[in-house]
Regions:
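Solvent-exposed edge beta-strands and adjacent loop segments
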Residues: 1-56, 87-117, 121-123, 131-203, ...
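RNase H-like, metal-dependent nuclease domains and their acidic two-metal-ion catalytic environment used
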Residues: 53, 280-282
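Short, acidic/charged, Gly/Pro-enriched secondary-structure junctions
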Residues: 57-95, 206-253
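Generic alpha-helical secondary structure signal
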Residues: 155, 186, 235-236, 279
Length: 292
């Protein structure tokens, strides 16, 4: 079972899903057996969804997907096949793209797709290229904040994530004779998340990145924050508390203005104090560059 996006199988795929949903209308009437108390669904048309989980192995490919979702109409050509028996193709909207980058694990990419045209069956089999991939470590993908015109990473980070969501609406009309449904994009949103150990700057000269105290002050002041999420590669600091140089990032994935919508801290006995912050984007973000 494999999912292809724009003619290529999703690299590093670990799981893919396909769902076909029938849209029905209740045709129950008083003259039915049982005096019309039993549902009598009649098929109207169908909708379909696909999903894929994979390791992040190609930063350039990830950036291309982000450009399609953020700068474009989020539509892609998809092909789904199961062995030699099932082969379906169609046009779909990426309704959610999520990148998770936890420390000590591989970075992962999750895609949710919603069909925006009817499916075409018997589309022919596509070759699945077999190749060994090198998944990117979660540690190599970081979130940074602009402070005094310079981007700084968050101190003692343990995980970061990026989520782009797309809202759709059905546009199927009486003129459409197909059994499937048509959809279009009506809205988009982006969010970022960081999870960290609570760290303290013991002296003004100590370099530890953005701390919980600094975040708390910014949230209470209602500041709009400039954030950037990207791939550092081997340039990331060896210690979790290092304040890595954002300019050394090999690839900036997204950047823009954000507001912190949730800041929470947890101080359990016998465990490290931790905090997490969630950010919602203000307007359209940039792909591949930082905003000053």
């Amino acid at each position: 079972m494999n999912l292809f996006v724009d003619g290529a199988v999703v690299a590093g795929s670990t799981s893919c899903t396909f769902t076909l949903s029938a849209n029905t209308a209740d045709a129950a009437s008083k003259t039915d057996l049982g005096d019309g108390m039993w549902d009598n669904p009649e098929f109207q048309n169908y909708g379909w969804q696909m999903g894929n989980e994979s390791f992040v192995a190609n930063v350039a490919g990830l950036q291309t997907l982000l450009q399609k979702v953020i700068n474009g109409n989020a539509e892609v050509d998809v092909h789904f096949q199961v062995g030699d028996d099932v082969s379906m193709s169609g046009r779909a909207i990426i309704t959610q793209l999520q990148v998770s980058a936890p420390n000590g694990e591989k970075a992962t990419l999750s895609l949710s797709l919603e069909g925006c045209t009817p499916l075409s069956g018997n589309a022919g089999q596509m070759d699945v290229a077999k190749a060994k991939i090198s998944p990117i470590k979660g540690k190599a993908m970081m979130l940074a904040m602009q402070v005094s015109n310079t981007y700084h990473t968050f101190a003692a980070s343990t995980s970061h994530s990026l989520t782009v969501s797309v809202q759709t609406a059905e546009t199927t009309t009486k003129d459409d004779n197909d059994m499937g449904t048509y959809k279009e994009v009506t809205g988009k949103s982006i969010s970022l998340n960081t999870e960290n150990l609570v760290s303290v700057k013991n002296s003004p000269s100590q370099v530890t990145g953005i701390t919980f105290a600094e975040m708390l002050a910014k949230v209470m002041a209602g500041e709009t924050l400039k954030l950037a999420f990207g791939y550092y590669g081997s340039s990331i600091g060896a210690e979790a508390g290092d304040d890595a140089d954002w300019n050394a990032a090999e690839t900036v994935l997204v950047s823009g203005d954000f507001v912190c919508t949730n800041l929470s801290a947890n101080g359990a006995n016998k465990e490290n104090a931790t905090y997490s912050a969630e950010f919602s984007g203000k307007g359209m973000p940039s792909v591949g560059e930082t905003e000053n």
